[in-house]
Amino acid sequence: MTKNALPKPIIMHLPYQSIDDRTEVERALSKNYGDAPLSIVERSVLHYIFDYPTVYVVHSEKENKHTAHAEYTVYVGETNNIHNRTMQHLKTDSKSRDDWKEFHKRLQRDPQSVWQYIIGNAHFNKSLTLDVENRLMHYLLGSDAVKTLNNRRTNAQGDYYTQDEFDQIFSDIWLELNRQDPELFPAEEIIRDSALFKASPFHQLSDDQLAAEEAIMGALSDAFADTDKNDVSRLIFVQGAEGTVKTVLISHLFYRIVTEMNVDGYLDDEDDEDALESDTTRVIGKDDRRKAYILVNHKQQVHVYNQIATKLGLQKGPDEVSLKPTQFINKFSEKKPNGRGIPDRPQGKADIVLVDEAHLLLTQGNQGYSGKNMPHDLLRRSRVVVAVFDPNQILQNAQQWKDEDLQALFPHHELDKTWSSRD
């Protein structure tokens, strides 16, 4: 089938509690399909909404008191049965999950305050809906109107039967959503130009990146199996390329670390029970919550990661998850009377620390860092450090890593993994 012949998306927009309300369903259909006889619309449309896999976008908006602009709380999901999934969110998840508790509060105050888009297509299958769900998360992360974006997984799929249709089907979906609500769903070119889109954890990884990520996650699992038995800090050494390819992998990796190894306990899909059986979950345990940080040397990138973490609910305030190395060292240090940390006096430990551009860490003190060796200070404050390191990118004498530094920090248990840039 040619791209022009692909079936167009079927999109219904209705109040969230109205899935059982025949009148509301008919009203939503009439809005999209005009004066067509409902009996014909039912046969051609309702079948793909209620009997096929669908993707859904639940949203609620509040006005920002300072800017008077609308701010959206959004949940994106996919399901094989939209009716049952809606009932699950309303009756079960609203009692146990923070994201759905918030929607429930809003519904109690005003039944018209929470709506959902239900997206169907005659060519939808499980893999295709998972890809659509993942890209919707990716795009909505770059929407300025979205304040909070909820889901608990990255779902980019590998090869499958209708994969060659995905880009066209998604573009048609986004174009129609943009037509219906341009504030929540801005034009594609606006989304793709945003810094959050470029650093999003929802990019689809290449085979090399996936292999590197799985190796790192496996090494983390092994490291925690050891550190759960003793207090020895471990370091996972990742050798990688610079640029956008690295940023995409680091963002994707950190999101997986937080949502899988920190064990949020949220599973969105009834078919996702296998997530409970992952190696990392078995090692850590469902109720053993951990804290992870991402350290970045550049202030602008710290800001971008902070925005992503806040939108995805990984932190409640700024600088809780993404920090500069000096901020992290200060956070986990005994304090002087002026509030500054003492690098030689660690206080407490983070569970997992992901260090971007570890080659830029200082190996001697300077005006902004009173310690003697940043890599050493980070290890003393962390149970496991994942260091992304490229010795060819060292820029200053204060960042020079001597052979003895490398031998001391990267003993036989390190992970040395290189991934390459591929278009």
Please annotate each region the language model reported.
Residues 235-239, 293:
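Short hydrophobic/aromatic beta-strand immediately N-terminal to the Walker A/P-loop
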Residues 201-234:
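N-terminal pre-P-loop "Q-motif" helix
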Residues 273-280, 285-308:
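Conserved Walker A/P-loop ATP-binding site and its immediately adjacent core
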Residues 1-88:
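GIY-YIG nuclease catalytic motif and its immediate N-terminal context
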Residues 186-208:
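Conserved adenine-nucleotide phosphate-binding loops and their immediately adjacent elements
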